[in-house]
Swiss-Prot record:
SMART domains: WD40. It comes from Arabidopsis thaliana. Residues 100-165 are annotated as: Disordered. WD repeats lie at residues 172-209, 213-252, 255-292, 296-335, 338-380, 382-423, 426-465. Pfam families: WD40_CDC20-Fz. Keywords: Cell cycle, Cell division, Mitosis, Repeat, Ubl conjugation pathway, WD repeat. The gene is FZR3. The keyword Protease does not apply. This is Protein FIZZY-RELATED 3. Associates with the APC/C complex. Interacts with CDC20-1, CDC20-2, CYCA1-1, CYCA3-4, CYCB1-1 and CYCB1-2. Binds to GIG1 and PYM. Belongs to the WD repeat CDC20/Fizzy family. The keyword Cell cycle applies. PROSITE patterns: WD_REPEATS_1, WD_REPEATS_2, WD_REPEATS_REGION. GO terms for molecular function: anaphase-promoting complex binding; ubiquitin-protein transferase activator activity.
Length: 481
């Protein structure tokens, strides 16, 4: 049986819907049909299925702070955002955040600066942390990176204790003597009282070279550069030359009135300094005892060193003077009087010509550096102790100094900064004697405590590997066919 609604309209209408609502829907549909003639409209049908997730527990993963932010927290978030963008995209991308409010900055877009991230050529002169490939600004204190400078090397470790200690009885505690020297053939010569002993470093063999007798004593020893002959200065003013291999005396030369406390060889001339204030030049190829006399010091000569090119001779004396001589004159070309105590410690730089270092005694305590070309003092360092000896490393640009009162220490310096590399202690008395091994790595020090101590202070020479030729001439062919 049909319902009353269906009989009137002839349609089966659902419950709750009358003919009036149907008429309104029909009118609305006809109106939409008219409006579609003017402009097309998108279909109201959707091709996506959007599920309802009201029952899911996504709120459990919402870890953001729902509390209202404070100005301090907002400032921290802004600083963090600026730093993050600077780390990811460079400082230029974060710089608009620093611009005043209302500025024309483009901080919202990290790619706002127009820069080429990949280029065929890098302009090293304009490289800065703004480049996406530059190091992090967090690793630089000043905010500027330097692509060309390598990272700083860790400080070199120097052993604080000697690797060998030898007893040296009768080793004299006299500041003005020089009785220890190490030859280029790895033989150490030591003057002990009236005798000279040779210690071979390769096998620790000890050989007695000579005995001057009860009325004489050894005041200085010096090997030739080749290491075959050794000169000995005596308390009677003589200079003896011995064959170190055969242990035979070759020659004896006089000329000094009193003890000969210092000797220095160049390629062919032997220079000797004495308490009589004179410097004698000996040539063993001629018959006379000496070929020239250099007069300039007013007190005992206690330091002598030839430059590596044999052009200049530096002499130090108890008159606090440092004199520089050349081969063409018997008058000093330089008189350096800045020291206030005796100048015994003298060394020439093997790395730079005309660079001379000298050390003063107890009243001076300074190491001074000189340019012998113009006589200018380059630097002066107060060591705090009497400077007894100086030696420049031939392997690296470093210098070692031995000291007396008041600390009796051995100090290693880096030139030209003169920063301390190491300070070595062990001698109970002032360290009066110093010599360097032929490989330039080890030094031996002697003191009035009658001990010789061997220290490893300098690194070895870096051997440069030869560059292999990979060109056309390196194909291994010895002839053209």
């Amino acid at each position: 049986m049909a319902s009353p609604q269906s009989t009137k309209t002839g349609l089966n209408l659902p419950a709750g819907m009358n003919q009036t609502s149907l008429r309104l829907e029909t009118f609305s549909s006809s109106f939409r049909g008219i409006s579609s003639l003017s402009s097309p409209s998108k279909s109201t049908c959707s091709d996506r299925f959007i599920p309802c997730r009201s029952s899911s527990r996504l709120h459990a993963f919402d870890l953001q702070d729902k509390e209202p932010t404070t100005p301090v927290k907002e400032g921290g978030n802004e600083a963090y955002s600026r730093l993050l963008k600077s780390e990811l995209f460079g400082s230029d991308f974060a710089s608009p955040l620093l611009s005043p409010a209302g500025g024309q900055g483009s901080a919202s877009s990290p790619m706002s600066p127009c820069t080429n991230m990949l280029r065929f050529k890098t302009d090293r002169s304009n490289s800065s942390p703004s480049s996406p490939f530059s190091p992090s600004i967090l690793g630089n204190d000043n905010g500027h990176s330097s692509d060309s400078s390598p990272p700083p090397k860790p400080p070199r470790k120097v052993p604080k204790t000697p690797h060998k200690v030898l007893d040296a009885p009768s080793l004299q505690d006299d500041f003005y003597l020089n009785v220890v020297d190490w030859s280029s053939q790895n033989v150490l010569a030591v003057g002990l009282g009236t005798c000279v002993y040779l210690w071979t470093a390769s096998n620790s063999k000890v050989t007695k070279l000579c005995d001057l007798g009860p009325n004489d004593s050894v005041c200085s020893v010096q090997w030739t550069r080749e290491g075959s002959y050794i000169s000995i200065g005596t308390s009677h003013g003589q200079v003896q030359v011995w064959d170190g291999t055969q242990c035979k005396r070759v020659r004896t030369m006089g000329g000094h009135q009193t003890r000969t406390g210092v000797l220095a060889w160049n390629s062919r001339i032997l220079s000797s300094g004495s308490r009589d204030r004179n410097i004698l030049q000996h040539d063993i190829r001629v018959q006379s005892d000496f070929v020239s006399k250099l007069v300039g010091h007013k007190s005992e000569v206690c330091g002598l060193k030839w430059s590596h090119d044999d052009r200049e001779l530096a002499s130090g004396g108890n008159d606090n003077q440092l004199l520089v001589w050349n081969n063409h004159s018997q008058q000093p070309i330089l008189k350096l009087t800045e020291h206030t105590a005796a100048v015994k410690a003298i060394t020439w730089s093997p790395h730079q010509s005309s660079l001379l270092a000298s050390g003063g005694g107890t009243a001076d305590r300074c190491i001074r550096f000189w340019n012998t070309t113009n006589g200018n003092q380059l630097n002066s360092i107060d060591t705090g102790s009497q400077v007894c000896n100086l030696a420049w490393s031939k392997n690296v640009n470093e210098i070692v100094s031995t000291h007396g009162y008041s600390q009796n220490q051995i100090m290693l310096w880096k030139y030209p900064s003169m920063s301390k590399v190491a300070t070595l202690t062990g001698h109970s008395m002032r360290v009066l004697y110093l010599a360097t091994s032929p490989d330039g790595q080890t030094i031996v020090t002697g003191a009035g405590d009658e001990t010789l101590r061997f220290w490893n202070v300098f690194p070895s020479v870096k051997m440069q590997t030869p560059v292999k030729d990979t060109g056309l001439w390196s194909l291994g062919r010895t002839q053209i066919r």
